[in-house]
Amino acid sequence: MKNTLRNILLGGLVVAMTASCELNLIPTTDITYEEGTPLLLTERDIAEFQNGVIASYRGLHYGSYYQTVEVMTECFNATIDFGNNYGFVHKLGSGFLASDDYTTGIWQNHYGAIKNYNIALEQCEMVTDEELLPDTDLLKGITLFCRASSYLTLARHFSADYDPATAATELSVPLILVYDQLHKPVRATLQEVYDQIIT
């Protein structure tokens, strides 16, 4: 009995000591983004930004981003062992709503990638070293393509079909061309979105 009581007391002390430790430590090795600070200082920086842009783009072009659309539009017929995978999408039932994970994932992840693209484009404009300009121009071109691709996907999924007669008044998705955490974007017209995609 004495040993049990002593073990409980020691266990309580260990828990109390652990809980009183300072666990809210601030990391000192992270890189924080400060607006206006140049990040593209070497060829390696540009190559790493380019890898990040391409990784963001590649991450948006597989899996549920495309399977959902395929299941909806290609009239796939479920077999007996399909396990109700993409069930609501397959039958377009009342459970498939705008708040469905397949829908919100497309919206969230494309805008997350657009944020990365906008930061990369902002950084490209800050490069003044003549030796880095060719690599910077390549990064800028890749990033503009990736951002246009994301806007095209968003416009196709969350807007009406493009009709030249109504494009100037039909609302589409928000156009965010500069990274600003505090900005509350409004929906742009379909014409504005497609003009941005083309340019």
Roles of regions detected by a PLM:
Residues 58-63, 78, 150-161:
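Secretory-pathway/luminal and periplasmic proteins that interact with or process carbohydrate-rich
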Residues 39, 43-44, 57-59, 63, ...:
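A structural signal for short, hydrophobic/glycine-enriched beta-strand patches
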Residues 51, 55, 115-122, 195:
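Solvent-exposed, polar/charged alpha-helical surfaces in well-ordered, non-transmembrane soluble domains
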Residues 21-70:
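Membrane-proximal, proline-rich intrinsically disordered regions
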Residues 86-158, 188:
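Conserved, well-structured interaction surfaces
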Residues 34-35, 82-102, 169-188:
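Short, helix-capping/interhelical loops that line the mouth of catalytic, cofactor-
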